Amino acid sequence: NDKENRVNGIALYYRLPMVQVNDEQSFIEQAEWSMLVQLFNQRLQERIQSGELKTISGGTARSVKIAPDYQSLFFRVNARDDNMQDAANALMAELATIDQHGFSAEELDDVKSTRLTWLKNAVDQQAERDLRMLTSRLASSSLNNTPFLSPEETYQLSKRLWQQITVQSLAEKWQQLRKNQDAFWEQMVNNELAAKKALSPAAILALEKEYANKKLAAYIFPGRNLSLTVDADPQAEISSKETLAENLTSLTLSNGARVILAKSAGEEQKLQITAVSNKGDLSFPAQQKSLIALANKAVSGSGVGELSSSSLKRWSAENSVTMSSKVSGMNTLLSVSARTNNPEPGFQLINQRITHSTINDNIWASLQNAQIQALKTLDQRPAEKFAQQMYETRYADDRTKLLQENQIVQFTAADALAADRQLFSSPADITFVIVGNVSEDKLVALITRYLGSIKHSDSPLAAGKPLTRATDNASVTVKEQNEPVAQFSQWKRYDSRTPVNLATRMALDAFNVALAKDLRVNIREQASGAYSVSSRLSVDPQAKDISHLLAFTCQPERHDELLTLANEVMVKRLAKGISEQELNEYQQNVQRSLDIQQRSVQQLANTIVNSLIQYDDPAAWTEQEQLLKQMTVENVNTAVKQYLSHPVNTYTGVLLPK
């Protein structure tokens, strides 16, 4: 009984020796184990999306290293509405169908094609794969005692040796796994009702026998549609153009959308397209706000246009594009990465995600069910419950409240899709930030065709309003922590009255670096009993206020003493300000980041997007280098005293052991 687990479910585990990859035969064997896992996952997701499996809310197969030379391979499904019998039936049926019919050649070809494309992309993009990825692969190679293969070697070996992997060889591998005696069933439950519905060991074995003797129908692979059709507007055009700075251009399209074009100084072959909408979940009423991120997640898992979720995965691999989205309070970001030698698929994808997004009914039902389960079990996850209480305490706004089960149930897949589409319903409220080394002429044709053809919706969304701030100080204590540690947080809110510009923000950041160091030295290193400490400043440009979060984990009996010490450290540092040496260190670190930023497509795109959201100016960041040189100790300390001397409100909270 795992109280902190969000879902109930049943799993079958096998334990078996790790394959030590040291020759071609072991390379093939390792690939076969990996493909069995992928084939199971692909089929399970397809059957959930198609509505064939409505009795479960999800599932997965995985291989996990459990010892230097041993692995665990498991197959798990998640129950819906605590129904453990349905979950057991679903898993037994999946396993028995594979026992009887194996996997089809079409399924195997699809997995091979997608994986080979990913490996080929890794070879093509080797120059951009950073040092962390290289060290991670080196560490993995060392840990698993396997030869270190370059992306090129891995791709060429896979391309040649995977031809020996057939549905017959995988069927033999599957039977080898199923005959493995080192196996056990596990049922995970997070509440008493699910525990009562759990099957007895005898019932599990009887069910396994029943399905082994059942004649089950073979799975029919639905195939892949790999075409994405986009209707272009022949009337679309660029209505104005403005140079904002060197290598930074602003275009306005005839549909009202704005496009910012930037070139990076590096050699990357990457093109980043980010749509920034000035609508986010705060544009929605309290009854919907907390479901908008869930709707966005459902869209991401449902495919776009004519492409199903699985087809989109394959299409994206073949066209070297990736897509992600994020909903925040006042904005929604939709990011697509493409290649400079083939930028068109990136534009096609972002157009279709905005104009022809879909939500699969079965995916929505699964996510909805998971959200309800998470709500029901919130009491069992004290850290999450504590964070939610602190969030509600800092605001006097219904939009901070969690929805109840009846409100979640009322929100249909059609409602979720309509809400998600509203985030990008008005082109005039979208700015597209495009970063990469592609000629402007080539980009202009793609921008006009794919971004200029986005139409204005019939139901545009009003801009959101910031959360209403609580006006009274408050304190929260939750005594539900399962671990013998205390989690403490203190939020201080400062009213800036005027928008915080980039120069002020840099002064505040320089001060916070020095403050964080003080807190670390005084609390964590000298006053033992604190395990971690952090200091974070954030600015809300719409609400025109500044928040400072002090957070630490410590021995439960010492949280009051350490808070007093932390506040003394903050008062002393505010009175003292920062020194010349500390400012120099800050300037050097920021300058290093700026140098890297100019060469990195992703970092430059993030900087422009942040500039747009924080300062409503896509070119604000271009002043950073000059402002950095102009910073003085006096200016920093004056700004800090002006903005951080008088908190308007203080909210404290502590999560203590039971």
What do the predicted segments below correspond to?
Residues 1-26, 30-31, 38-49, 109-113, ...:
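Proteolytic maturation boundary segments
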Residues 6-26, 44-162, 183-189, 267-300, ...:
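M16 family metallopeptidases and their MPP-like homologs
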Residues 33-37, 520-524:
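Long, His/Glu/Asp-enriched segments that create or flank divalent metal/ion-associated functional microenvironments
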Residues 37-38, 289-297, 513, 517:
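Active-site recognition of the HExxH zinc-binding catalytic motif
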Residues 165-169, 173, 358-359, 364, ...:
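Peptidyl-prolyl cis-trans isomerase
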Residues 360-366, 457-461, 577-578:
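Conserved short beta-strand edge segments in small beta-sheet-based binding/regulatory domains
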